[in-house]
Amino acid sequence: MLSLDQIPHHIRHGIVGSRLIQIRGRVTQVTGTLLKAVVPGVRIGELCYLRNPDNSLSLQAEVIGFAQHQALLIPLGEMYGISSNTEVSPTGQCIRLGWVNICWGRCWMV
């Protein structure tokens, strides 16, 4: 059996840093343009994918806060089709706007 020391650094880094299970949540409430969803482990500024298994809805949303163990999300596109069946999948990434990275309430040059 191989130990981690026998695996090249770039491959080892990919193995150690990868998610082995895909975390998903579900939309629980929609008020205006604000979505509430139960999604374990998300962070403020993180992008999530919104998908409906029963139609072609697929768009991104940003986590902007939390309320009573639910994530508050703002969709980045047309909301038509969002329902209680909408799955929320965190990406682990933040918004990238050209030369600036915006993530977790901070802004820095790329």
UniProtKB/Swiss-Prot annotation:
GO biological process, alphabetically ordered: ATP metabolic process; proton transmembrane transport
Induction trigger: Temperature seems to play the major role in regulation of transcription of the lcrE-containing operon of pYV, whereas Ca(2+) concentration has only a moderate effect at 37 degrees Celsius, and no effect at room temperature.
Keywords from the UniProt entry: Plasmid
Domain of life: Bacteria
Matches recorded under InterPro entries: ATPase_F1/V1/A1_a/bsu_N
Protein name: Uncharacterized 12.2 kDa protein in lcrE 5'region
